[in-house]
């Protein structure tokens, strides 16, 4: 029996059905790697980020996520170099898709029960995405901006529905706007923590006491 088309599982019709002690025998997700490229370089290296954003509420299979990751990764290696980017898949397939197998050969009417007990068995995994949710993000240096847009465009061909490519206003994968990053770093308002940053806030009695004495 062939694999059921992904269009059968495209829409979010019911509640999420994750793997649990009641839902056993779930096959492994096809996608196992969510970060590609220079994933260990810190936040200072790649200031520019582009997102592939979903414009529909739908389910995306783990096979499609893996195909999109491979497509974008190969294009970036070929056109920008393997040390010039960092790709991150932003959604994870936790929803279990079920199938009620039906025999279609001659004489099958004596072997199957039709819709009696039709709950189905686990068949695959999918990610449930909402409108405006990023599916994939790539951070690079400014000279590779055109290559990133083309890579995300090719990755979008692997997904159903509508997606848009958007340029992030943040520096890399951080939560600091690009125009503030260099200034805040010189002022010591945050410290670099891998691909992200840790904002240093004044809190606690010691800082409060210093402000009172200064006043």
Curated annotation (Swiss-Prot):
One of its GO terms (biological process) is translation. It comes from the Eukaryota. CDD domains: Ribosomal_L16_L10e (cd01433). Transmembrane segments: none annotated. InterPro entries: Ribosomal_uL16, Ribosomal_uL16_CS_euk_arc, Ribosomal_uL16_dom, Ribosomal_uL16_euk_arch, Ribosomal_uL16_sf. One of its GO terms (cellular component) is ribonucleoprotein complex. Keywords: Ribonucleoprotein, Ribosomal protein. One of its GO terms (molecular function) is structural constituent of ribosome. Coiled coil: none annotated. NCBIfam families: PRK04199.1-4 (NF003239), uL16_euk_arch (TIGR00279). Component of the small ribosomal subunit. Mature ribosomes consist of a small (40S) and a large (60S) subunit. The 40S subunit contains about 33 different proteins and 1 molecule of RNA (18S). The 60S subunit contains about 49 different proteins and 3 molecules of RNA (25S, 5.8S and 5S). Belongs to the universal ribosomal protein uL16 family. This is Large ribosomal subunit protein uL16. It comes from Euglena gracilis. The lineage of its organism: Eukaryota, Discoba, Euglenozoa, Euglenida, Spirocuta.
